[in-house]
Amino acid sequence: MKRVLLFLATNMAILLVVSVVFNIVMAVTGIDAQGSVGLLVFCALFGFGGAFVSLWISRWMAIRSTGARVIEKPQNQSEEWLFRTVQQQAQKAGVPMPQVAVYQSPEPNAFATGRSKNASLVAVSTGLLQSMNADEVEAVLAHEMSHIANGDMVTLTLIQGVINTFVMFFARIIASAIMRGGDNQRGGGFAYYGVVMLLEIVFGVLASTIVMWFSRQREFRADAGSADLVGKQKMIAALRRLQQGKESELDGTMLAFGIKGKRSTMSKLFMSHPPLEERIHALEQRR
Protein backbone atom coordinates (compact mmCIF):
# COMPACT_ATOMS: atom_id res chain seq x y z
CA MET A 1 0.00 0.00 0.00
CA LYS A 2 2.73 2.45 1.01
CA ARG A 3 4.66 2.15 -2.27
CA VAL A 4 1.51 2.67 -4.37
CA LEU A 5 0.26 5.70 -2.42
CA LEU A 6 3.75 7.20 -2.46
CA PHE A 7 3.98 6.73 -6.22
CA LEU A 8 0.49 8.15 -6.82
CA ALA A 9 1.04 11.16 -4.55
CA THR A 10 4.39 11.95 -6.16
CA ASN A 11 2.92 11.48 -9.61
CA MET A 12 -0.06 13.75 -8.85
CA ALA A 13 2.25 16.50 -7.57
CA ILE A 14 4.47 16.22 -10.62
CA LEU A 15 1.44 16.13 -12.91
CA LEU A 16 0.15 19.41 -11.48
CA VAL A 17 3.55 21.07 -11.92
CA VAL A 18 3.86 19.62 -15.42
CA SER A 19 0.37 20.90 -16.21
CA VAL A 20 1.39 24.46 -15.37
CA VAL A 21 4.49 24.17 -17.57
CA PHE A 22 2.38 22.54 -20.29
CA ASN A 23 -0.09 25.44 -20.27
CA ILE A 24 2.77 27.90 -20.66
CA VAL A 25 4.22 25.88 -23.56
CA MET A 26 0.79 25.77 -25.23
CA ALA A 27 0.41 29.52 -24.89
CA VAL A 28 3.87 30.17 -26.36
CA THR A 29 3.56 27.67 -29.23
CA GLY A 30 -0.06 28.54 -29.98
CA ILE A 31 -1.29 24.94 -30.03
CA ASP A 32 -5.07 24.80 -30.38
CA ALA A 33 -6.53 23.55 -27.09
CA GLN A 34 -9.74 22.42 -28.77
CA GLY A 35 -8.30 19.13 -29.93
CA SER A 36 -5.50 18.27 -32.34
CA VAL A 37 -2.86 15.65 -32.90
CA GLY A 38 -0.35 18.14 -31.55
CA LEU A 39 -2.29 18.48 -28.30
CA LEU A 40 -2.42 14.70 -27.85
CA VAL A 41 1.29 14.37 -28.57
CA PHE A 42 2.12 17.10 -26.07
CA CYS A 43 -0.15 15.45 -23.46
CA ALA A 44 1.59 12.11 -24.00
CA LEU A 45 5.01 13.73 -23.76
CA PHE A 46 4.22 15.49 -20.51
CA GLY A 47 2.00 12.70 -19.14
CA PHE A 48 4.58 9.95 -19.56
CA GLY A 49 7.34 12.34 -18.55
CA GLY A 50 5.71 12.99 -15.19
CA ALA A 51 5.13 9.27 -14.58
CA PHE A 52 8.73 8.36 -15.37
CA VAL A 53 10.09 11.16 -13.18
CA SER A 54 8.03 9.65 -10.33
CA LEU A 55 9.50 6.24 -11.10
CA TRP A 56 13.05 7.56 -11.34
CA ILE A 57 12.97 9.16 -7.89
CA SER A 58 10.79 6.48 -6.24
CA ARG A 59 13.61 4.79 -4.32
CA TRP A 60 14.99 8.10 -3.04
CA MET A 61 11.49 9.26 -2.08
CA ALA A 62 10.72 6.00 -0.25
CA ILE A 63 13.89 6.20 1.82
CA ARG A 64 13.33 9.88 2.58
CA SER A 65 9.63 9.58 3.47
CA THR A 66 10.03 6.58 5.79
CA GLY A 67 13.40 7.52 7.25
CA ALA A 68 14.64 4.08 6.27
CA ARG A 69 18.24 3.09 6.94
CA VAL A 70 19.85 1.17 4.11
CA ILE A 71 21.86 -1.80 5.37
CA GLU A 72 25.31 -1.36 3.85
CA LYS A 73 26.90 -3.61 6.44
CA PRO A 74 24.73 -5.66 8.85
CA GLN A 75 25.12 -4.45 12.43
CA ASN A 76 23.50 -7.37 14.24
CA GLN A 77 22.24 -10.92 13.72
CA SER A 78 18.76 -9.77 12.71
CA GLU A 79 20.12 -7.51 9.98
CA GLU A 80 22.57 -10.18 8.86
CA TRP A 81 19.73 -12.70 8.51
CA LEU A 82 17.57 -10.15 6.70
CA PHE A 83 20.34 -9.23 4.27
CA ARG A 84 21.26 -12.86 3.60
CA THR A 85 17.63 -13.89 3.07
CA VAL A 86 17.04 -11.12 0.52
CA GLN A 87 20.29 -12.05 -1.21
CA GLN A 88 19.27 -15.72 -1.47
CA GLN A 89 15.80 -14.86 -2.75
CA ALA A 90 17.20 -12.45 -5.34
CA GLN A 91 19.43 -15.21 -6.69
CA LYS A 92 16.53 -17.64 -6.77
CA ALA A 93 14.25 -15.12 -8.49
CA GLY A 94 16.96 -14.25 -11.00
CA VAL A 95 17.16 -10.53 -10.20
CA PRO A 96 20.09 -8.35 -9.07
CA MET A 97 20.52 -7.85 -5.34
CA PRO A 98 18.31 -4.92 -4.24
CA GLN A 99 19.14 -2.48 -1.50
CA VAL A 100 17.83 -3.67 1.88
CA ALA A 101 16.53 -1.17 4.41
CA VAL A 102 14.83 -1.08 7.81
CA TYR A 103 12.69 1.77 9.11
CA GLN A 104 11.13 2.51 12.48
CA SER A 105 7.38 1.85 12.62
CA PRO A 106 5.16 -0.20 14.94
CA GLU A 107 3.01 -1.20 11.94
CA PRO A 108 3.93 -4.52 10.31
CA ASN A 109 4.83 -3.30 6.84
CA ALA A 110 7.15 -3.93 3.92
CA PHE A 111 7.51 -2.56 0.42
CA ALA A 112 9.64 -2.78 -2.71
CA THR A 113 10.32 0.10 -5.05
CA GLY A 114 12.85 1.38 -7.56
CA ARG A 115 13.09 2.43 -11.19
CA SER A 116 14.19 -1.02 -12.43
CA LYS A 117 15.26 -4.49 -11.36
CA ASN A 118 18.83 -3.18 -11.32
CA ALA A 119 18.01 -0.27 -8.99
CA SER A 120 15.46 -1.60 -6.52
CA LEU A 121 14.87 -1.45 -2.79
CA VAL A 122 13.25 -3.79 -0.28
CA ALA A 123 12.37 -2.19 3.05
CA VAL A 124 10.76 -3.66 6.15
CA SER A 125 9.47 -2.04 9.31
CA THR A 126 10.73 -2.84 12.78
CA GLY A 127 7.13 -3.73 13.63
CA LEU A 128 7.12 -6.49 11.02
CA LEU A 129 10.39 -7.96 12.29
CA GLN A 130 9.09 -7.93 15.85
CA SER A 131 5.61 -9.34 15.20
CA MET A 132 6.41 -12.16 12.76
CA ASN A 133 8.53 -15.28 12.99
CA ALA A 134 11.32 -16.08 10.54
CA ASP A 135 9.11 -18.09 8.15
CA GLU A 136 6.53 -15.31 7.96
CA VAL A 137 9.12 -12.58 7.38
CA GLU A 138 10.71 -14.79 4.73
CA ALA A 139 7.34 -15.01 2.95
CA VAL A 140 6.85 -11.25 3.10
CA LEU A 141 10.32 -10.68 1.64
CA ALA A 142 9.55 -13.18 -1.13
CA HIS A 143 6.34 -11.28 -1.85
CA GLU A 144 8.29 -8.05 -2.27
CA MET A 145 10.96 -9.81 -4.32
CA SER A 146 8.20 -11.01 -6.65
CA HIS A 147 7.13 -7.40 -7.22
CA ILE A 148 10.68 -6.66 -8.36
CA ALA A 149 10.93 -9.78 -10.53
CA ASN A 150 7.56 -9.01 -12.15
CA GLY A 151 8.61 -5.45 -12.96
CA ASP A 152 5.48 -4.09 -11.29
CA MET A 153 6.72 -0.54 -10.80
CA VAL A 154 7.61 -0.14 -14.48
CA THR A 155 4.25 -1.55 -15.54
CA LEU A 156 2.52 0.77 -13.08
CA THR A 157 4.44 3.69 -14.59
CA LEU A 158 3.31 2.82 -18.12
CA ILE A 159 -0.31 2.58 -16.96
CA GLN A 160 0.03 5.87 -15.10
CA GLY A 161 1.57 7.46 -18.18
CA VAL A 162 -1.42 6.49 -20.32
CA ILE A 163 -3.80 7.77 -17.64
CA ASN A 164 -1.90 11.05 -17.31
CA THR A 165 -2.06 11.53 -21.07
CA PHE A 166 -5.81 11.15 -21.29
CA VAL A 167 -6.48 13.08 -18.08
CA MET A 168 -4.56 16.06 -19.45
CA PHE A 169 -6.05 15.70 -22.93
CA PHE A 170 -9.71 15.39 -21.96
CA ALA A 171 -9.39 18.05 -19.23
CA ARG A 172 -8.37 20.53 -21.91
CA ILE A 173 -10.95 19.38 -24.45
CA ILE A 174 -13.79 19.66 -21.92
CA ALA A 175 -12.46 22.93 -20.50
CA SER A 176 -12.43 24.36 -24.02
CA ALA A 177 -16.03 23.23 -24.53
CA ILE A 178 -17.07 24.83 -21.24
CA MET A 179 -15.35 28.09 -22.08
CA ARG A 180 -16.54 28.16 -25.70
CA GLY A 181 -18.80 31.09 -26.42
CA GLY A 182 -17.13 33.28 -23.84
CA ASP A 183 -14.08 35.47 -24.07
CA ASN A 184 -11.73 32.47 -23.90
CA GLN A 185 -12.56 30.62 -27.10
CA ARG A 186 -8.99 29.54 -27.68
CA GLY A 187 -8.56 28.35 -24.14
CA GLY A 188 -6.76 31.40 -22.83
CA GLY A 189 -7.26 33.21 -19.58
CA PHE A 190 -7.07 32.28 -15.94
CA ALA A 191 -10.63 30.91 -15.89
CA TYR A 192 -9.77 28.30 -18.50
CA TYR A 193 -6.63 27.17 -16.67
CA GLY A 194 -8.58 27.00 -13.42
CA VAL A 195 -11.15 24.72 -15.04
CA VAL A 196 -8.35 22.58 -16.49
CA MET A 197 -6.74 22.15 -13.07
CA LEU A 198 -10.06 21.25 -11.46
CA LEU A 199 -10.89 18.71 -14.17
CA GLU A 200 -7.42 17.16 -13.92
CA ILE A 201 -7.90 16.59 -10.20
CA VAL A 202 -11.38 15.08 -10.67
CA PHE A 203 -10.35 12.90 -13.62
CA GLY A 204 -7.14 11.93 -11.81
CA VAL A 205 -9.08 10.65 -8.79
CA LEU A 206 -11.51 8.71 -10.98
CA ALA A 207 -8.72 7.29 -13.13
CA SER A 208 -6.89 6.12 -10.01
CA THR A 209 -9.45 3.30 -9.79
CA ILE A 210 -7.72 1.78 -12.84
CA VAL A 211 -4.35 1.95 -11.12
CA MET A 212 -5.83 0.43 -7.97
CA TRP A 213 -7.41 -2.40 -9.96
CA PHE A 214 -4.02 -3.22 -11.46
CA SER A 215 -2.44 -3.00 -8.01
CA ARG A 216 -4.91 -5.54 -6.60
CA GLN A 217 -4.17 -7.95 -9.44
CA ARG A 218 -0.43 -7.68 -8.98
CA GLU A 219 -0.82 -8.39 -5.25
CA PHE A 220 -2.32 -11.76 -6.13
CA ARG A 221 0.61 -12.34 -8.50
CA ALA A 222 3.14 -11.37 -5.85
CA ASP A 223 1.47 -13.72 -3.36
CA ALA A 224 1.76 -16.51 -5.93
CA GLY A 225 5.39 -15.55 -6.54
CA SER A 226 6.09 -15.78 -2.82
CA ALA A 227 4.46 -19.21 -2.76
CA ASP A 228 6.79 -20.32 -5.56
CA LEU A 229 9.87 -18.99 -3.76
CA VAL A 230 9.24 -20.16 -0.19
CA GLY A 231 6.02 -22.21 -0.22
CA LYS A 232 2.41 -21.14 -0.02
CA GLN A 233 1.96 -22.18 3.62
CA LYS A 234 4.50 -19.58 4.73
CA MET A 235 2.71 -16.86 2.77
CA ILE A 236 -0.66 -17.92 4.13
CA ALA A 237 0.80 -17.84 7.64
CA ALA A 238 2.11 -14.30 7.07
CA LEU A 239 -1.28 -13.09 5.84
CA ARG A 240 -3.04 -14.72 8.78
CA ARG A 241 -0.62 -13.05 11.15
CA LEU A 242 -1.59 -9.70 9.66
CA GLN A 243 -5.23 -10.72 9.90
CA GLN A 244 -4.86 -11.28 13.64
CA GLY A 245 -3.20 -7.93 14.19
CA LYS A 246 -4.81 -4.65 15.05
CA GLU A 247 -6.51 -3.01 12.11
CA SER A 248 -5.00 0.25 10.94
CA GLU A 249 -7.40 2.89 9.65
CA LEU A 250 -5.49 5.24 7.37
CA ASP A 251 -7.71 6.37 4.51
CA GLY A 252 -9.72 3.21 5.08
CA THR A 253 -6.78 0.98 4.28
CA MET A 254 -4.20 -1.05 6.11
CA LEU A 255 -0.59 -0.07 5.68
CA ALA A 256 0.60 -3.64 5.32
CA PHE A 257 -0.73 -5.93 2.64
CA GLY A 258 -4.41 -5.21 2.78
CA ILE A 259 -7.48 -4.45 4.85
CA LYS A 260 -8.90 -6.45 7.70
CA GLY A 261 -12.58 -7.07 7.11
CA LYS A 262 -14.82 -6.41 4.13
CA ARG A 263 -15.46 -3.00 2.59
CA SER A 264 -18.19 -1.61 0.42
CA THR A 265 -17.99 -1.95 -3.35
CA MET A 266 -17.26 1.76 -3.82
CA SER A 267 -14.53 1.71 -1.19
CA LYS A 268 -12.95 -1.36 -2.78
CA LEU A 269 -12.50 0.54 -6.04
CA PHE A 270 -9.89 2.69 -4.30
CA MET A 271 -8.11 -0.16 -2.48
CA SER A 272 -4.58 -0.93 -3.64
CA HIS A 273 -4.70 -4.38 -2.01
CA PRO A 274 -7.42 -7.05 -1.93
CA PRO A 275 -8.88 -7.98 1.47
CA LEU A 276 -6.72 -10.48 3.33
CA GLU A 277 -9.50 -13.08 3.19
CA GLU A 278 -9.45 -13.04 -0.62
CA ARG A 279 -5.69 -13.35 -0.77
CA ILE A 280 -5.64 -16.27 1.65
CA HIS A 281 -8.43 -17.98 -0.29
CA ALA A 282 -6.54 -17.54 -3.58
CA LEU A 283 -3.45 -19.16 -2.09
CA GLU A 284 -5.43 -22.01 -0.58
CA GLN A 285 -6.96 -22.77 -3.98
CA ARG A 286 -3.54 -22.76 -5.63
CA ARG A 287 -2.00 -26.12 -6.39
UniProtKB/Swiss-Prot annotation:
Its cofactor is Zn(2+). It is a multi-pass membrane protein. Pfam families: Peptidase_M48. Signal peptide: none annotated. Disulfide bonds: none annotated. Its EC number is 3.4.24.-. Its main location: membrane. GO terms for biological process: proteolysis. The active site is at 144. The keyword Plastid does not apply. This is Protease HtpX. It comes from Idiomarina loihiensis (strain ATCC BAA-735 / DSM 15497 / L2-TR).
